[in-house]
């Protein structure tokens, strides 16, 4: 760090898959909480640098929010519903501690669901798009394996998310601040899946089957953010539509399947 002398540090490294955290809670907590602490401690002890630091928390910190408390603003109580979410509560608090205790220019985001091309196939929309692409090429039977389809999510495009992160650290950054960031379109996982299927060349043939292995013991079932604070501060607004994001995601998996790449079916 002292050699590179960064102006900005974006800390997004994490064990970021909630379902994995149920089977690997210790690794998730260590990676996400202690990993954040080690990075911020290292930056604190570096000489002659004072970067603006983005610590990426998660909307999962809010967990199971009653419908009457929607949309979720920054002051909504934490109610984490997975070891991953607990680890992100720790990440969130470690970041704010370093801002308050040491004056480091740390800002924290609670990003709601964002997706697009290249998102890993452990996440619902990516595994659905991947399965659809494989079905279109007759690589698997026309059955999409799913988990819980009733959770409500607010969707944004990863390209909008990256733009938000850049604006976070460049538009009047305020040490210790924390922001909810997310899209404006929300729907259930089922509705998202139905939209992806509607884009398929084999939409009339595709069936849906619940796979118990894909279900979490507990889920954050209502994720609708109030992003007023960040929008008012930075001027950021999502620009890419849900429909465009889903189209691009499916095209990404079609191109990977068409390339002949070998990968596991999830």
Positions of PLM-derived features:
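NAD(P)H-binding glycine-rich loop region in Rossmannoid oxidoreductase-like domains
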Residues: 1-31
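SDR active-site strand-loop-helix element
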Residues: 9-13, 53-59, 109-111
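Catalytic helix-loop patch of NAD(P)-dependent Rossmann-fold dehydrogenases
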Residues: 23-41, 49-51, 60-108, 115, ...
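NAD(P)-dependent short-chain dehydrogenase/reductase
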Residues: 65-71, 93-167, 184, 189, ...
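Mid/C-terminal beta-alpha module of Rossmann-like enzyme folds, strongest
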Residues: 128, 171-215, 227
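Conserved C-terminal active-site "lid" loop/helix of NAD(P)H-dependent oxidoreductases
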Residues: 158, 178, 191, 212-237, ...
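Non-catalytic, hydrophobic alpha-helical segments
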Residues: 161, 165, 181, 192, ...
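Amphipathic terminal alpha-helices
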Residues: 242-266
